[in-house]
A protein has these predicted regions:
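Sec-dependent signal peptide recognition
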Residues: 2-7
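Hydrophobic core
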Residues: 9, 13-14
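N-terminal, active-site-proximal structural segment of metallo-dependent hydrolase catalytic domains
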Residues: 15-117, 130-134, 195, 286, ...
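Metal-dependent phosphoester-hydrolase catalytic domains
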Residues: 30-49, 188, 202-213, 219-296
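Structured beta-strand-rich core segments of catalytic domains in phosphoester-bond hydrolases
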Residues: 32-37, 42-52, 99-175, 269-273
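Active-site-proximal beta-strand elements of phosphoester/diester hydrolases
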Residues: 57-70, 150-152, 169-183
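Active-site beta-strand/loop signature of hydrolases that rely on acidic residues for catalysis
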Residues: 59-65, 82-107, 141, 177-180, ...
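Active-site environment of divalent metal-dependent phosphoester hydrolases
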Residues: 67-70, 101-106, 132-133, 185-188, ...
Length: 296
């Protein structure tokens, strides 16, 4: 126990700051309502979207992009498709998992290329591991014009021989968004990571006057001990529709959370994105993106 506490404390020597599963039936009393399609003249393919965005909503997206090489062999074509999906969905901020940065697999900063394709968005890359002469990790993209007050990376503790993990954090003047990709190897290692995630939030953002969101590929289903441990500090605000597996998707492992001790939000709706007008979302990655609409 003393060794674990020492590991957790070492993660947080940082500058202080801030301080319904498978839902498809329309139901006005259910916040995870299905978007039945729209022809409004907004961003997207010819202004169309299957997921209409409510007026005044802030739309958060999480997306494991699989290093932009799962099914489309040309990286730039894959990035182009993902950027079109983000535009069609009208996301206001996106957390991204499985990004390459200047390695021999992809000699490019992938999150920077995506941000450019989105029209000059701002970005942050958080390295998880050294990989093939470069790096591999998570990222966050936010529109140009958003005021970023801090961006940083939290290295999660790793007392094992398994892959190291991290959190990529962007703090703006209105909200905090943190993207992470947790391990799946052993329950003990997963719990060590989750204790560190919870301790990071408690240490840095307890009582924060703006909402704090944590999102990404948790590699755990909703009924797992891992998600139960996260729920001691966080609320799941995204749909629990399936996000990964041979299409149609068979498991939910990608989530968006809200930190209980930060400023409150109201959830308007959420979905896993299983179809888009701009292209075949099942070919963009082996994961489906997830969004949630909130107001705060």
């Amino acid at each position: 126990m003393k060794k674990l506490l020492a590991i957790l404390l070492s993660v947080f020597i940082m500058v202080p700051s801030c301080g319904g599963e498978g839902v498809s039936k329309e139901d006005p009393d259910n916040p995870y309502i299905w978007g039945g399609g729209s022809n409004k003249d907004e961003p997207g393919s010819e202004g169309k979207t299957y997921y209409p965005k409510p007026d005044g909503a802030f739309r958060i997206m999480t997306y494991n992009v699989g290093a932009f090489h799962k099914y489309i062999s040309v990286m730039n074509q894959n990035i182009d498709l993902v950027s079109k999906i983000i535009k069609e969905i009208e996301a206001d901020v996106v957390g991204i998992n499985e990004l390459d940065s200047m390695n021999t697999r992809h000699n490019a900063n992938q999150v920077a290329l995506l941000a450019k394709e989105l029209g000059g968005w701002q970005w942050h890359f958080g390295k998880a591991i050294d990989y093939q002469g470069g790096a591999y990790g998570n990222g966050v993209v936010v529109p140009k014009g958003v005021r970023i007050v801090d961006k940083y990376t939290v290295a999660l503790p790793n007392p094992t021989s398994y892959e190291s993990r991290s959190i990529a954090v962007v703090e703006t003047d209105k909200y905090v968004l943190a993207a992470s990709h947790l391990d799946h190897s052993t329950e003990d290692y997963i719990q060590i990571q989750i204790q560190a995630v919870n301790a990071w939030a408690q240490t840095r953002y307890a009582g924060c006057d703006k909402p704090v969101f944590y999102l990404g590929d948790m590699n755990s289903v909703p009924t797992s001990e891992a998600i139960k441990s996260l729920l001691t500090c966080w609320d799941v605000i995204s749909s629990k529709e399936n996000t990964v597996g041979t299409m149609p998707a068979t498991r939910c492992i990608d989530y968006i959370f809200h930190y209980k001790k930060s400023a409150p939000v109201k959830v308007l709706g959420s979905h896993t994105i299983s179809r888009t007008y701009c292209g075949d979302v099942s070919k963009a990655s082996d994961h489906l993106p997830v969004y949630v609409d909130v107001v705060f």
